[in-house]
Regions:
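Long, compositionally biased, glycine/small-hydrophobic-enriched stretches that function as flexible linkers
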Residues: 2-160, 480-490
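N-terminal small/glycine-rich loop or linker at the start of catalytic domains
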Residues: 86-88, 92, 160-183, 303-318, ...
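Glycine-rich, proline-tolerant flexible connector loops at the mouths of alpha/beta enzymes
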Residues: 131-132, 143, 147, 207-225, ...
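Alpha-helix-loop-beta-strand connector modules within alpha/beta enzyme cores
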Residues: 154-157, 171-172, 177, 217-245, ...
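Hydrophobic faces of well-ordered beta-strands that scaffold small-molecule active sites
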Residues: 173-182, 205-210, 236-244, 260-265, ...
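Active-site mouth loops of central-metabolism enzymes
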Residues: 175-190, 315-325, 386-395
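Active-site loop/lid in soluble adenylation, ligation, and acyl-transfer enzymes
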Residues: 486-567, 725-728
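C-terminal functional extensions of proteins
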Residues: 646-730
Length: 730
C-alpha cells in the first residue's frame, strides 16, 4: 500500500513546448509529422478509432517512418514534452503520470526509445518493473508501438507483480478470474445462481463483482450485502465489489455497507474523466483515503482499489485531445499507478467498431494494454470482449485470450457462457478460464485453490497436478434443494444449460449460445419502422448526420448531430419535456417496447401536469442526440428512448434504455460544476436501462420514467447530483 499520495502541486512537470516537426526521407520524398501527438499516432498499429480521428498513418511506409523516428528519440525528449490540451494546459491525468521515480528516470533519460525496447527484451521482469517506475504513460506507449507480437508477449510474460486482499493475486503460475454475475434487474436470485455457477467452476478468486443495473446507494448497498452473505455462506476466500460510480460506493461505505474493494472506470484525459465519467483526481484521492481509513479489509489487505480502462473511450466521447488510443490508455495506467490498486483490467472491445473494427485490431490492442500495464507496475487483468455490432467475434476473442494467457495476464472475466445479461456484450467465461488453466498449466490463487480442493471442485491427480474435481461445474451443490435451484434458474435469463464436456460447455449448450448471438447480430441491422410508431402515437421525424446504416455503426458521432434541415424544422416550444425516440443499435427494441411504454409514459406525464411536445423520432440516432435537440427546442428535459446494443439471449436484443437528459440552467451550473468537478457542465443524465419483457417490463419502466422525471424537474438536477439530493432528504 502506498504510504501517501503526492499532492498534484508537488509533481514536477516540464513546461509545454510548441509542436516540432519530425521527418525523414521516404522513397518518394520527405515524410513529415507535425507534433509529438501526430508522430505517436502514426507509429501505432492501425485501428479504427485512430483512423477516424485522423491520427493513424496513411500507409505502411508512413507508419514505419514514424516508428523509425520515434525509435531514435530519447526518453528525455518525450519526457520534456508533455502532451497538452488544446489550450496548452497540462491536465491532471498527465500531471499524475509525471509522479515517477526520479532516480530511475535520471539513469535512463539518455536512452533512445529503441534502446529502451532492447533493454526490456534483454533484461529480466524485475528489471522491467524497475525501469517502468521511471516512465510516464506516454513513454511507455512509445516503446509499445515499436514492439511486434512476440515482443509484447515476451516482456509482459516476464513481469510478475502480485497484490493482496483476501487472496494473493498475480503470483507466478496462477491465472485468476473476476466472477461477474450481472443481472438485468439486479435480481438477487439471478445473481446468486451466477455466483454459485462460477464458484463451482473455480472462478472468482480475484473478485466477485457485480455491475449494477441501478446505481443508487440503496441498491448498491443491498447488492453488496447480498454478495457478502453469499461469500460467507460459501466460505470462499475472495473479495467483493459492486462496480457502481465511486460516489455511490463511498456513500454506501459511509452507511456501513461492506465496500471491500473500491471501483472506478478511468480515462486517459481529464476532459473525459471529468465531463463524461463525473470523476476528478481529487475524488479518486478521497476514495483512496476513505478506504485506507474505513475499508472493511483495511487491516489485512495490502491493496483495495480496482480500476477498469479500455482503448477508445476518449475518442468515442470526442475528448482525446489529439492523442491516440494506445497513448491515452497508457495514461490511464499512469493514473491508476498512483493508487497501487489490487486489480485493474481493460475492456478494450466494449465500445464497438468505431474504435476497433475487427479481431486483429482487438488482439493487438489487448496485447499492448497488457504490456503497458505490467511495465507500469500494475496487476493487469483482461476483459477480452466484443459486441455484436462490431466485426469481431468469439473465435477472435479466443485467439486473443490464448496469447494473453501466454503473456501472463493476471486474470480474465467469468461472464457465464460469455454472455453478459446486463451490459449486452460478450466476454470470457469460467469455461474459458479453466480451459486456459489446463492449456497453460496455471492454477487459481493459492488460498482459493485450497478452498476448491476442499470442496471437490478441483483435485490433484497422481502426479500432484491440479485437475477438475468431481464437483466441478455443479452449481446445485450450493443449493439446499432442487426447488431452490429451480427458483434461481427461473429468475436468470440466457441460461442455455449447465452440461459440460471437459472444461468446455457441451456442444448442445454451445449451439444454443451461438444461435442467440446470431439473432442478436441480425437485430443490429434491422431498419427502424417509423410507420409502426405512428400507429402508436403521432411522431415528428428528424434526420441525423448518419446518412447510412454503415456510417451509423462506424462513426457514432454522426448519430449525435441532427442535420441542418432537421434543426430548421424545429422551433422552440413551451414544453418542459420532450420525448425523443431513436433506433440506436436495436430497432427491435423500439418496435417491441414502445407500444406499451409510450402511451403510458405520455399519460403519466400529463397526469402530473408536465407539458410534453409531440414525440420526435430519429433513424441512426445515438445517445447524445438528445443534447442538441433539447437545446434547440428549449426543453428542460429530453427523455431519449433508444435501442441498446443486442446481447444476452435473443430476447435481450429487444432491450431499450431511457436517457433522461437534463439541460442545466445557467443559475444551476455552479452547483452542478461543484458536484461533478466539470466547470463546463451543461447536461446531467439519469439512465433507466434494460427495458424489455425479461428485464424491466415496459409498463413498469413508464412509471419509473414518470417518477424520475418529476424528481428531476422538482430538484432541478439529474444523475449523481440528483441521487445525492434525494439521499439527503431521506
Amino acid at each position: 500500500m502506498a504510504a501517501h499520495l503526492n499532492p498534484l502541486s508537488a509533481i514536477a512537470v516540464p513546461p509545454a513546448r510548441p509542436d516540432e516537426t519530425y521527418g525523414c526521407e521516404g522513397p518518394e520524398g520527405p515524410i513529415r509529422f507535425v507534433g509529438l501527438k501526430r508522430l505517436l499516432g502514426a507509429a501505432d498499429f492501425p485501428k479504427a478509432g485512430d483512423r477516424h480521428a485522423g491520427l493513424a498513418a496513411a500507409t505502411e511506409t508512413e507508419r514505419e517512418a514514424a516508428r523509425s523516428i520515434l525509435a531514435g528519440l530519447t526518453i528525455a525528449h518525450l519526457h520534456q514534452r508533455p502532451l497538452c490540451t488544446a489550450d496548452g494546459r497540462v491536465d491532471d491525468v498527465m500531471r499524475v503520470n509525471y509522479d515517477i521515480d526520479a532516480d530511475v528516470y535520471g539513469e535512463i533519460a539518455g536512452l533512445t526509445i529503441g534502446g529502451l525496447k532492447d533493454r526490456l527484451l534483454a533484461g529480466s521482469g524485475e528489471e522491467a518493473l524497475r525501469l517502468g517506475r521511471g516512465l510516464t504513460g506516454v513513454t511507455a506507449a512509445a516503446v509499445a508501438k515499436l514492439c511486434d507480437i512476440h515482443e509484447l508477449v515476451l516482456v509482459a510474460r516476464r513481469i510478475v507483480h502480485p497484490t493482496r486482499a483476501r487472496t494473493l493475486l498475480g503470483a507466478r503460475g496462477t491465472l485468476s478470474s473476476r466472477l461477474q454475475p450481472n443481472h438485468p434487474t439486479d435480481d438477487p436470485r439471478g445473481i446468486t445462481l451466477l455466483i454459485w455457477w462460477g464458484l463451482s467452476m473455480a472462478a472468482g478468486d480475484a473478485l466477485i463483482g457485480v455491475n449494477p443495473a441501478i446505481d443508487t446507494v440503496a441498491n448498491v448497498s443491498a447488492v453488496l450485502r447480498l454478495l457478502d452473505g453469499i461469500r460467507r455462506q460459501a466460505g470462499a476466500p475472495t473479495q467483493i465489489c459492486v462496480l457502481s460510480h465511486i460516489k455511490t460506493q463511498l456513500a454506501a461505505l459511509e452507511e456501513g455497507a461492506p465496500v471491500e474493494i473500491l471501483f472506478q472506470s478511468l480515462a486517459g484525459t481529464e476532459a473525459t474523466l471529468t465531463a463524461e465519467f463525473d470523476v476528478t483526481v481529487a475524488l479518486l484521492d478521497r476514495g483512496w483515503e476513505a478506504m485506507r481509513a474505513h475499508g472493511p479489509l483495511k487491516d489485512s489487505a495490502a491493496q483495495f482499489m480496482y480500476f477498469e480502462t479500455g482503448q477508445g473511450s476518449e475518442f468515442s466521447y470526442g475528448r482525446h485531445d489529439g492523442i491516440d488510443m494506445t497513448t491515452t490508455e497508457a495514461l490511464c495506467y499512469g493514473l491508476a499507478r498512483r493508487y497501487d490498486p489490487f486489480m485493474i483490467n481493460n475492456v478494450t472491445g466494449f465500445i464497438g467498431p468505431e474504435t476497433h473494427a475487427d479481431n486483429f485490431e482487438l488482439l493487438v490492442a489487448s496485447l499492448q494494454d497488457l504490456f503497458l500495464a505490467k511495465l507500469l507496475g500494475l496487476p493487469m487483468g483482461i476483459g477480452s470482449c466484443y459486441t455484436l455490432h462490431a466485426g469481431s467475434g468469439l473465435e477472435g476473442q479466443q485467439a486473443t485470450t490464448e496469447l494473453l494467457a501466454a503473456a501472463g495476464a493476471t486474470y480474465f472475466m467469468d461472464v457465464a457462457l460469455n454472455t453478459d445479461r446486463m451490459l449486452a456484450y460478450f466476454d470470457t467465461s469460467a469455461h474459458d478460464n479453466q480451459t486456459l488453466r489446463e492449456i497453460h498449466g496455471r492454477e487459481p490463487a493459492g488460498e482459493f485453490l485450497a478452498w476448491c480442493l476442499g470442496r471437490g471442485i478441483l483435485a490433484r491427480d497422481a502426479a500432484g497436478a491440479v485437475v477438475r474435481g468431481p464437483e466441478w461445474g455443479r452449481p446445485e451443490r450450493f443449493c439446499e434443494s432442487s426447488e431452490e435451484l429451480a427458483e434461481l434458474v427461473a429468475a436468470t435469463p440466457a441460461l442455455h444449460g449447465f452440461e459440460t464436456a471437459g472444461p468446455r460447455p457441451a456442444d448442445a449448450v454451445s449451439r444454443r449460445v451461438r444461435f442467440h448471438q446470431a439473432v442478436g447480430r441480425g437485430a443490429v441491422h434491422l431498419p427502424l419502422d417509423v410507420e409502426r410508431l405512428r400507429a402508436i402515437h403521432p411522431v415528428r421525424e428528424i434526420a441525423t448526420a448518419a446518412a447510412t446504416h454503415e456510417a451509423h455503426l462506424a462513426s457514432p458521432g454522426l448519430g449525435t448531430r441532427p442535420t441542418g434541415a432537421a434543426l430548421a424544422s424545429l422551433n422552440a416550444e413551451p414544453f418542459a419535456v420532450q420525448v425523443l425516440i431513436s433506433d440506436g443499435l436495436s430497432a427491435a427494441a423500439v418496435h417491441h417496447n414502445l407500444p406499451d411504454l409510450l402511451p403510458l409514459l405520455l399519460e403519466g406525464l400529463s397526469a402530473k401536469g408536465i407539458g410534453v411536445g409531440v414525440p420526435l423520432v430519429a433513424r441512426h440516432g445515438r445517445v447524445k442526440l438528445a443534447e442538441p435537440v433539447g437545446e434547440h427546442l428549449g426543453a428542460d428535459l429530453v427523455i431519449h428512448l433508444i435501442g441498446e446494443r443486442p446481447g444476452g439471449d435473443a430476447l435481450a436484443s429487444r432491450s431499450l434504455s431511457a436517457y433522461l437528459v437534463y439541460r442545466v440552467p445557467a443559475e444551476q451550473r455552479g452547483d452542478a460544476a461543484r458536484a461533478s468537478g466539470n466547470v463546463d457542465i451543461r447536461h446531467e443524465v439519469t439512465v433507466i436501462s434494460n427495458i424489455y419483457s425479461a428485464g424491466l417490463p415496459p409498463v413498469e419502466a413508464a412509471a419509473q420514467i414518470v417518477e424520475k422525471t418529476g424528481q428531476i424537474l422538482a430538484c432541478r438536477a439529474a444523475g449523481n447530483r440528483l441521487e445525492g439530493m434525494l439521499a439527503a432528504k431521506c
